[in-house]
Amino acid sequence: MQAINSTTNRFGGVLILPEALPDDPETFAAQLHHSLASWRAEGFLVVWLEVPIAKSKLIHEAVEQGFAFHHSGDGYLMLTYQLVADSFIPPYSTHYIGAGGVVINDREELLVVSERYRGSDNRPPHYKLPGGALNQGEHLATAVVREVHEETGIEAEFQRLVCFRHWHGYRYGKSDIYFVCRLRPLNETIVKQDEEIAHCLWMPLGEYLDAEHVSFFNKQIVRAALSSPGVAPTTMEDHRNPELLEFFMPEGLD
C-alpha cells in the first residue's frame, strides 16, 4: 500500500492532497494508518489534512487516528496531526481587522453614525466613526472607503492612516486591530444604511469632542486625526505585486 498523495513544506510538514482522498471511510482509514507510519519513519513532523465538505464522512476516521481540528472554511475542514510530539503547529488567524474613517467636511463637521443594534432604545445615540471589518484580501485603504460609503452614502478619498488600537479577547478568543484613517469627503448628501445604522449626521467637531455620550476613546482618535500627520499609502518599486501588499509611510521620504 502506498502513502496518500501529498506534498511537503520546508518546515517538516506533509500536506495531503484533498483530491487524493478516497470516498470510502474504511479505505481512507487503512490508507491513513499506513501513511502516518511511513511519514513518521521518513522524519516528518506534522501532517496537514484538508477534508472537502463533500468528503466530510472521512473526518471521524481522521479524529479516531489522532488528528485535531485546526480551522475551517465554507467548503472544507483543516485538521493536523503531530508525527513528533510537541512539534510546532502555527495557529490559524489570530486577529480581526477593522477600520474607521475620520471624515471632516469644509465646515469642520465630522461624519458620525450610531449603530442600530445596541440594546435599549431609551439610551441616547452612541455616536462613533463609520467603518467596519475588512474583507478577505481587501486593502485597508479600500476597505475604509467602502465601509464609509456603505454606512453613510458618502464617497470619500483616503488620505492617511492616523493610529490604531490593538485589543485582545475580542471574539472567539481572537484579538482585534482597529485602524483609524483620515478621509476627505467627495460629497455631503447622507444616504443612511438602514439595516445597521440608526442615526447618521454631520456633527460639528466641537460638539462631538464635548459630548458626554461620546466615549473618551472615540474623542481621542478624532483628536489624533486632527493633530497627527499620520502615514500615507506608498509603493515600493522593488517589492512584489501592489495588489498583494499595502505600504504606509511618512510623507517626504526619499
Question: Language-model features: where?
Answer:
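Nudix hydrolase/Nudix homology domain
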Residues: 2-11, 15, 19-30, 38, ...
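Conserved beta-strand-loop-alpha-helix junction that forms the acyl-donor binding cleft
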Residues: 49-56, 134
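Long amphipathic N-terminal alpha/beta scaffold segment
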Residues: 57, 64-98
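N-terminal strand-loop-strand
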Residues: 83-127, 156, 160
